């Protein structure tokens, strides 16, 4: 029992999240300064939304979304995928040979012109938040509610 335990897990988690947010803000600034993306309208708010989404699914705060983080994201969206499909998704988005994709890869995919599966996933998540229109017959009204 010579190990020392860090009993301040919440504080350490907060520090890691702050460091992660700082790294992501630096990358966002690079994209804001890049003339290639200067024509995108409302770029700062898009980058802020992408940052929140990326931080939500980067479970281990290592700067990359791995296969388990992607699996969690897909299941949360109600679109579970097989291990092979997840590997293909990562290979499509990632610029390197690893089994993760970085925030820069994520931004290039989201701001790029090519269509990718993750772009559609985020679009479906936005649609899921919209209120569904009621179907079927309207509810019965009382006489006092009639015009």
From Swiss-Prot:
Keyword Repeat in record: yes
Description of post-translational modifications: Phosphorylated on serine residues.
GO molecular function: actin filament binding; calcium ion binding
PROSITE patterns referenced in this protein's UniProt entry, alphabetically: EF_HAND_2
Topology versus the membrane: Peripheral membrane protein
Residues modified as N-acetylserine: 2
One GO CC term on file: nucleus
Positions of the EF-hand domain: 45-80, 81-115
Superkingdom to which the source organism belongs: Eukaryota
GO terms classed as biological process: actin filament bundle assembly; actin filament polymerization; cellular response to type II interferon; inflammatory response; phagocytosis, engulfment; positive regulation of G1/S transition of mitotic cell cycle; positive regulation of monocyte chemotaxis; positive regulation of smooth muscle cell chemotaxis
Record's keyword terms, sorted: Acetylation, Calcium, Cell membrane, Cell projection, Cytoplasm, Cytoskeleton, Membrane, Metal-binding, Phosphoprotein, Repeat
Primary location group: cytoplasm
Region described as Disordered: 128-147
Binding site for Ca(2+): 58, 60, 62
Pfam families noted in UniProt: AIF-1 (PF21008)
Subcellular location: Cytoplasm, Cytoskeleton; Cell projection, Ruffle membrane; Cell projection, Phagocytic cup
Residues recorded with modification Phosphoserine: 39
Known function: May play a role in macrophage activation and function.
Name of the protein in question: Allograft inflammatory factor 1
Encoding gene per record: AIF1
């Amino acid at each position: 029992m010579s190990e020392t335990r860090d009993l301040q897990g919440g504080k350490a988690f907060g520090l890691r999240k702050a460091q992660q947010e700082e790294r992501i803000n630096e990358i966002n600034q690079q994209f804001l300064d890049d003339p290639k993306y200067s024509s995108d309208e409302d770029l700062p708010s898009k980058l802020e939304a992408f940052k929140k989404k990326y931080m939500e699914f980067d479970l281990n705060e290592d700067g990359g979304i791995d296969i388990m983080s992607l699996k969690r994201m897909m299941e949360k969206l109600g679109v579970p995928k097989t291990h092979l499909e997840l590997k293909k998704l990562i290979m499509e988005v990632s610029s390197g040979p690893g089994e993760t994709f970085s925030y820069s890869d994520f931004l290039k995919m989201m701001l790029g012109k090519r269509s990718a599966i993750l772009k559609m996933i985020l679009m479906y998540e936005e649609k899921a938040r919209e209120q569904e229109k009621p179907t079927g017959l309207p509810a019965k009204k009382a006489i006092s509610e009639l015009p």
